[in-house]
Structures are given as structure tokens and as C-alpha cells.
Amino acid sequence: MGALPSGGAPKLVTGPRFRSPSSHSRVYMNRIRNFSIIAHIDHGKSTLADRFIQHSGALSNREMAEQVLDSMDLERERGITIKAQSVSLEYRAKDGQTYELNFIDTPGHVDFSYEVSRSLFACEGALLVVDASQGVEAQSVANCYTAVDQGLEIIPVLNKIDLPSSDPQRVIQQIEEIIGLDGEEALKISAKTGEGIEELLEALVQRVPAPKGDPEAALKALIIDSWFDNYLGVVALVRVFDGALKKGDRIRVMSTGREFQVDELGFFTPKRVLRDRLDTGQVGFVVAGIKDIDGAPVGDTLTSAQKPADSPVPGFKKVQPRVFAGVFPTSSDDFENFRTALEKLRLNDASLHFEPETSQALGFGFRCGFLGMLHMEIVQERLEREYGLDLITTAPTVVHEVLTTDGETLYIHNPSELPAPNKIEDIREPIIAASILVPEEHVGNVIKLCVEKRGVQKEMQYVGNQISLVYEMPMGEVVLDFFDRLKSVSRGFASFDYEFKRFQSADLVKVDVLINGDKVDALAVIVHRDQAQSRGRELTDKLKEIIPRQMFEVAIQAAIGNHVIARSTVKALRKNVTAKCYGGDISRKRKLLEKQKAGKKRMKQVGKVEIPQEAFLAVLQVDNKKS
């Protein structure tokens, strides 16, 4: 994310680029174009951004790396964009004018929809990039509707037209039928070969409106993203809506009221270019000596401390995590390093929430809130890769709304927090609306999967040779493996997007796992009563395979309250104590066997069963086994 090179001090480039004399602010604003690219994973967005950078001459051919903006190794490896990025480019159009193009990158995955809404809010236009061989995906549809709601000018673009499998006519028809844009206006390009890039840049300049705003008004700048830099502290990526941001100004963060002094301003081209001011309509970075991570909340508004704006930039909501999991370091010595790593990560990721948690089985760790499963995987992988931590993650859960008999409403993030059954009046589970686009030949398998996940069909319509399905289903059913299984039953052709709808009453119970009579809090799950018996049986069988045999018998039980619904037993290892007896009286052997039996009984009372790490993932594997 516009981040700095990891080795050595940041390389600075200063220069006369992007001059914006304040007397000509309004004239200059007319030559700014702020735009975003909406695209599904792997439809060529990062490659197109590279072509723009190359075309404007911002980097020499030697400096161009593939996917310049995807600066995290993880982003390049998985081929997805996770963070919002920005790059400012100069483009001399055919009308002879030089335009400033501010491209704000957006992630494409469903988990990162909040990052998309922030990026789109800072733009006046968007390019809808669709792979000409694959067609429109559910994800792009959702992000495109967000852009339409925010009043952006949308330019449809067909990418990868150089592929033999591309079918532009079919995709144009899809764009018209599914999204409702005029497909005939779609531009045909190949980001890989550079074909059609010039025409696309001209269309950007002609069709995307210039930013609106009052250069004379009080400063109002939206924080699109922020990240932590080892040299500079917090760096914020901002879009100026009104007024101007100048070096040396005292600025105020509107939600917290905290004040800072601007030390550095500038753009990414994608090199860092320092400037003395950012004017209305411009996008750039601000360094203001913010040392702690909560100093620049993403989605907040910066204003002048001397002459503050009356109201912040509208339309931003605090993002709510939907999926929770306990994350614990394997070594308790790493706890403080783990806390620091999470705090640093949270600066780059406003949607990550965490609070300390103690588990009898796993020790000290954190209960972390994520946007979805991909978000959870990426956070865990970044913690392990960038901070060298070794972590155990418990099975993910969703938030449940619980009405107690006292009339109190609780939000439960962790099954172990659920009150006793006699204290619960009602449990409500989160329901989502899942939009699925699937080719006709796979629709039967997809419907079967949705029904298995307790889904209720709300809509079904034919769109060319694709079928658009809308299902309402419990989020708890989706969170573990729905996405993987959807890809599996549709041979990888189905695409999926979801949004939270409401909490709805359901007959849910907590299944506890007891090992030798002791509850293991990290293995508890909340499931529908109809599935409790089979889920408990699968869980105990799985744990029986994983827990090693001890010198004494180990009982594994699944229980709802005090009612045991399933049990497995790990048989004891047995030493042959009578081996040293040869012949002789049977009472001698019996005495040795009785002694062994008494010893095992005593051992069972005081012995602790070591639970291996894989046991905590067994909850996940129980679901995967069904796929």
C-alpha cells in the first residue's frame, strides 16, 4: 500500500510536478480526475494500473515491477489486492491539456467491501473492469452498485481481449442485463499488451467529472487509509474535499479532537514526491507526527485546528467485524510481541478488532474480529510471516444476539460466554443475503448446498447462460467452508457476495466438549439443535483420532448443558505387569493387577491430558469432511 521500501531509509523525490497555484485553484481543479477500478479477483486490475504508470512515464522500464501497487508479498502471491493504494499520474491529453489522474486502488474480495466503499467515496468516477473471457462476477456487481449509489460515473472496460477464449459480445450483454450499464460504450483493452490504453485514458479525461469543492472553505480531508512507517510514524492517505492542506498547519482529527502539526505532504507516483500543499480535489499523503495507532482512524475527517469545518465528510460508518476467532501464541513468552504485532497490523486495517482472552486450554491470547474468512487467513498469515509468530487459531464463530430472562440483550462473540440455558429467553443468529451467480449446468448442486446450509431462496433469475440466485441463510453456516464448497460443487464457476441482513430467532444450543469430565472452552461450538447430535458425534470421533493414548483411559464427551449427547473413549496403554511371574499362584498375579488398577485410578484423578494443537482445528475439519 503505497508503502515504503522495506530496506533502508525512504527514497524521496522532490520536484515541480503537480504545481497548483492557489490563485488558479478552480482552474486547476478542472484538470484533476479521481478514479477507482472495480474488478473481480484476477480480472487484471493491478496489471492495468501498471500500464497507466508506464504510459505516464512515472517509472522507467527498469523500475517497473509486475503489480507495482501490490506491495505486500502476500498480495502478489495470492494475486489479490488487500489494502487501498493511491498513485498520482500526469497525462497530456489530445486536447493539449495536462491532467492529474489520481488512481485510488480498491480490493476486490468480498471481505474487503469496507475498503472499497472508502476508496470509492474519494472518487468521481470508476472503471468497471471485466475479464472478456470470464464475464461478470457477483463481487463486481456488488461493488458496482456501491459506486452507482455514490453517484460515480462508471466506464465499462473489457480486459484480456487478446485471449483466444475472449467473447466480448457475450460480456457486453451481461453488463447490460446484470448491471444495467450501456454495454456498447464499453472499451476493449488488453492490460497485458497495452492495447487500447490510450483510448481508455482519453475516456477517463472526457467522461469522469472534475472534483467539486470550495478551495476557500475550511479544510475538510477524508482519511482513505493509514499505515505505520518505522521512520515517520503514522502516514495517512487523504482526499481533500474543501480548503487546502499546507505543510506546517495544525490539523484536528474530527472524531477524537486530537491535534497534530503537518510535517510532510506529497503524492505517490508511485515514488514519494514531497509537496508543500494539497489543494481541493487532490489525493496525497500526510505525515503529522502521529505516533500511536489510533491517531488517524480510517474514514475520519481532518480539519484545521484554527478554523475547523462544521461537519465531517458524510457517509462513513464504523465497520463491524462479523467473524470471531481466538488466536493464541504457541509460546506464552510471545504474548507481548503478539499484542504489539496486532496493534501495528490494526493501523493498516481498520476492520481488525481484538481484545485479550484467556483460555484454560491455550493460555493467554486475543479474541479477534474479522470481516470474513479470507480476512482471517490473511491476518494470521501476515502475523506469522511479518512478525515471526507461531499461532493457534480456534474455529471461527459469528456474533449471536441473546435475550436473557432478565430482559437484557447480550452480543456473544465466543461460545464459552453463552449464559446457562435456564437464563436464556431467546437466541438470535445473524442472517445474510447471499447473491450467487452460477452457470446453468451447475445450479442444481448450488441449490442443494444452500438448502443443506439452511438457506431460503428469495430470488432466481436467468441472465444469459448464467443464473442469479439470492438466498437468505445463517452466517454461522457460511463462515466455515461455504465458499470452498461452492467453488467445489460449481467447478470453480460460481461467484458469491453477501451482506448482513438481520438477527433472527433460531433453536440454537451450545455443544461443550468434556475431556475426562473437564470442559475445554476452546472446543465449544454453537449449532442448531437438529445438527447437535451428529455434530457432537463427529467431534468426539475426530478428537479420539487426535488425542494420543495415555496410561489411563480418556473419556471424550459432547454435552448440551448436563445432557451428554455423544461419547468416545481413548483406550489406556497397558503395561504387562504379570510378565515377570512364571507359573506360581494366581493370587500373586491378581495382586499385581489390582495394584496396577489402583495406580491407574489415582493417575486418572490427578493426570492431565495433553491436548495437541490439531484438536482445536478438529472443529473446522468436521465440516470439511462433508465436502
From Swiss-Prot:
UniProt-listed Enzyme Commission number(s): 3.6.5.n1
Subcellular location per the Swiss-Prot or TrEMBL entry: Cell inner membrane
Domain tr-type G, first and last residues per copy: 30-212
Matching InterPro entries: EF-4, EFG_II, EFG_III/V, EFG_V-like, EFTu-like_2, G_TR_CS, LepA_C_sf, LepA_CTD
Keyword Membrane: yes
GO biological process: positive regulation of translation
Catalysed reactions, as listed in the record: GTP + H2O = GDP + phosphate + H(+)
Keyword list, A-Z: Cell inner membrane, Cell membrane, GTP-binding, Hydrolase, Membrane, Nucleotide-binding, Protein biosynthesis
Family per record: Belongs to the TRAFAC class translation factor GTPase superfamily. Classic translation factor GTPase family. LepA subfamily.
UniProt protein name: Elongation factor 4
Organism of derivation: Alkalilimnicola ehrlichii (strain ATCC BAA-1101 / DSM 17681 / MLHE-1)
Higher taxonomy: Bacteria, Pseudomonadati, Pseudomonadota, Gammaproteobacteria, Chromatiales
Gene of this entry: lepA
